[in-house]
């Protein structure tokens, strides 16, 4: 278990709680349990030593024994003294709110290098801006002054109106960019997004050119996004200034990524699931504006409820985690990190020139900062989508409501394995209530297995009984879409629409719609997360069940296991906020 210093008392207790060897800390053969408060004081003492003495390279306390009364005692310690760590990260000021507004909500956009060739960045980006429904003014430069997609371009920026453009989207070569920035500044441009490559990722000469361009942008008062970036998305103003698709539905997830491909991945998941995006940006080389800068602004952005980030490496680890902690104290922050393995670290370095740090230390620092760390892009998006659409749980007590026994068993296993949630015992009064709605063969336990005894209103009524119970903190609902799956086969068969099938198909589909609506409405009414899961979310997304879940704006999870992982992230973050009085 790792945490960076300085530790707080809460950090120390969480480190102890995170040990895999919890049973060793309990009572054993008449000896007292370990005094966790005293053990936390040992950790706090080591933290104070490390903070006060930067020349301490390592401390090996061996052994740390526990007396019969439970008190820990350090018998011996080896302290290694080395050179003080004098490394310090860069501390560029974050761009202003006005500059970020120019990037994400510009009154006008200029595409430099607009092209009539549909394979060129200058065509694709202009097309995407126009096709996404952006209503601001759109301009383009083209050496021949050609008309591109109905936009009359100009050969020189000097020919454009002053004060009409906030954002320049740069599709011209690196060599042309210094003069271009000067001309844009003269027209009142406040933000520039550079797709141009050939900078810091391309060797020493490129790094010098990048540093010179950053200095020039600072001098001109222009926010410099990129270079070597993919683009920027802002759904509140229907802006899709990108060199690739897609444009996502509107929502409350803000995305910042060092990799443009990960931006595309998150936007694709948004389109698939219907859980929308507020802002998205690929930081590229992050020469002047880092992912942490974007995340810090997202934490202030009224359109954004949760931030989602991909990072490939850590240069200023302490500085980055301090920024992460500041963000997570205000809004949920989900991070997926490349370079977690030795092979991945090498790949990350070759991609954006990023340097990888020790992954275990990074993981511990994320936990300390309240950052939700995901292992995969799927887990990351689903965590962010859950934060964006579900209330935080007030406790770990979880009930599984299922229409099929096997799904409930597997999901119960997932809750136990996750370790953060509690598969609660079904309270006697709740069991008695449910008895009035289900046949005698139902499970009478958690998971609540309806045992095929549902009639028209059973699922919504049982779900409300569970949601209303004061000891229940969260619900995972399994089995939506089963009736609509049968309806699909009826429609595809040769007997439809006769034989009463048209009526029963409509009934089946309406039932699944009612179940999705009930899960959403009850979650809002009682302030408890209610996660709906079925493999039909991916196996048959047009099924009325998952389709109805999407219509509520919430995520329909592809399995109970994935719902449990997302719910565990919610409870972990809720605990982080509660313990720190946030």
Question: Across the structure, where does each feature detected by a protein language model lie?
Answer:
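Catalytic-core regions of core metabolic enzymes
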Residues: 1-582
């Amino acid at each position: 278990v790792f945490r960076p210093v300085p530790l707080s008392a809460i950090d120390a207790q969480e480190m102890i709680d995170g040990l895999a060897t919890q049973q060793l800390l309990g009572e054993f053969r008449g000896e007292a349990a370990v005094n966790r408060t005293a053990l936390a004081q040992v950790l706090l003492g080591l933290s104070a030593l490390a903070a006060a003495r930067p020349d301490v390279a390592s401390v090996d306390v061996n052994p740390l024994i526990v007396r019969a009364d439970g008190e820990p005692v350090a018998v011996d310690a080896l302290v290694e003294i080395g050179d003080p760590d004098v490394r310090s990260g860069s501390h560029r000021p974050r761009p202003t709110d006005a500059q970020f507004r120019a990037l994400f909500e510009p009154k006008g956009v200029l595409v430099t290098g607009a092209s009539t060739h549909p394979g060129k960045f200058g065509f694709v980006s202009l097309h995407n801006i126009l096709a996404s429904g952006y209503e601001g003014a759109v301009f383009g430069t083209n050496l021949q002054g050609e008309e591109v997609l109905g936009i009359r371009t100009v050969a020189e920026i000097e020919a454009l109106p002053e004060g009409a453009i906030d954002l320049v989207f740069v599709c011209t070569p690196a060599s042309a960019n210094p003069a271009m920035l000067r001309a844009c500044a003269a027209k009142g441009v406040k933000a520039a997004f550079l797709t141009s490559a050939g900078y810091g990722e391309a060797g020493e000469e490129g790094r010098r050119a990048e540093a010179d361009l950053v200095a020039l942008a600072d001098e001109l008062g222009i926010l410099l996004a990129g270079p070597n970036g993919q683009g920027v998305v802002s759904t509140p103003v229907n802006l899709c200034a990108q060199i690739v698709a897609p444009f996502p539905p509107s929502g409350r997830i803000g995305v910042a990524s060092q990799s443009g491909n990960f931006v595309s991945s998150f936007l694709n998941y948004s389109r698939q699931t219907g859980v929308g995006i507020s802002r998205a940006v690929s930081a590229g080389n992050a020469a002047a504006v880092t992912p942490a800068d974007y995340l810090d602004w997202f934490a202030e952005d009224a359109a954004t409820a949760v931030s989602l980030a991909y990072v490939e490496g850590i240069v200023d680890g302490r500085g980055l985690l301090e920024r992460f902690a500041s963000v997570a104290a205000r809004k949920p922050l989900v991070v997926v990190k490349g370079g977690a393995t030795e092979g991945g670290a090498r790949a990350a370095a070759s991609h954006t020139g990023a340097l990888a740090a020790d992954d275990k230390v990074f993981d511990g620092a994320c936990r300390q900062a309240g950052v939700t760390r995901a292992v995969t892009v799927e887990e990351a998006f689903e965590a962010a989508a859950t934060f964006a659409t579900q209330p935080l749980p007030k406790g770990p007590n979880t009930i599984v409501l299922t229409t099929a026994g096997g799904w409930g068993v597997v999901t119960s296993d997932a809750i136990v394995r996750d370790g953060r949630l509690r598969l609660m015992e079904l309270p006697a009064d709740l069991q008695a209530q449910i008895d009035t709605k289900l046949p005698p063969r139902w499970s009478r336990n958690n998971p609540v297995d309806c045992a095929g005894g549902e009639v028209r209103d059973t699922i919504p009524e049982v779900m409300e009984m569970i949601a209303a119970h004061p000891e229940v903190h969260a619900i995972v609902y399994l089995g939506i879409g089963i009736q609509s799956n049968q309806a699909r086969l009826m429609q595809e068969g040769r007997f439809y629409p006769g034989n009463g099938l048209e009526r029963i198909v409509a009934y089946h589909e309406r039932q699944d719609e009612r179940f999705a609506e009930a899960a959403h409405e009850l979650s809002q009414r009682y302030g408890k997360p209610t996660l709906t899961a079925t493999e039909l979310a991916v196996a048959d997304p047009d099924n009325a069940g998952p389709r109805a879940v999407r219509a509520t704006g919430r995520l329909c999870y592809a399995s109970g296991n994935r719902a449990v992982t997302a719910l565990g992230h919610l409870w972990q973050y809720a605990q982080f906020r509660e313990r720190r009085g946030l």
